């Protein structure tokens, strides 16, 4: 009976560690996805004003 309890306790402990490691890995993946989305938003924020200024400048020159 004592051996069975030790075995079950060991399985519970190892399962808990395994779940903890999986959760950390999942959190790291979510952070990477969030960072990618933020970077894409930054690029869009930088890209559109530049394109707008270029188009405005071109149409301004063509209109003269």
Curated annotation (Swiss-Prot):
Keyword terms, alphabetized: Amidation, Amphibian defense peptide, Antibiotic, Antimicrobial, Cleavage on pair of basic residues, Fungicide, Immunity, Innate immunity, Secreted, Signal
Keyword Secreted listed: yes
Principal location listed in the UniProt entry: secreted
Record InterPro entries: Frog_antimicrobial_propeptide
Cell compartments where the protein resides: Secreted
One Gene Ontology cellular component: extracellular region
One GO BP: defense response to bacterium
Tissue specificity annotation: Expressed by the skin glands.
Leucine amide modifications at: 62
Propeptide: 23-46
Signal peptide: 1-22
Reported function: Antimicrobial peptide with activity against Gram-positive and Gram-negative bacteria and against fungi. Has been tested against S.aureus (MIC=2.5 ug/mL), B.pumilus (MIC=2.5 ug/mL), B.cereus (MIC=30.0 ug/mL), E.coli (MIC=5.0 ug/mL), B.dysenteriae (MIC=10.0 ug/mL), A.cacoaceticus (MIC=30.0 ug/mL), P.aeruginosa (MIC=7.5 ug/mL) and C.albicans (MIC=1.25 ug/mL). Also shows a weak hemolytic activity.
Entry similarity comment: Belongs to the frog skin active peptide (FSAP) family. Temporin subfamily.
Name of this chain's protein: Temporin-ALg
Source organism of the structure: Amolops loloensis
């Amino acid at each position: 009976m004592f051996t069975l309890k030790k075995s079950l306790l060991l399985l519970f402990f190892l399962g808990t560690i395994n779940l903890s490691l999986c959760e950390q890995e999942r959190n790291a993946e979510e952070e990477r996805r969030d960072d990618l989305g933020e970077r894409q938003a930054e690029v869009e924020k930088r890209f559109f004003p530049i394109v707008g200024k270029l188009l405005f400048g071109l149409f301004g020159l063509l209109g003269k």
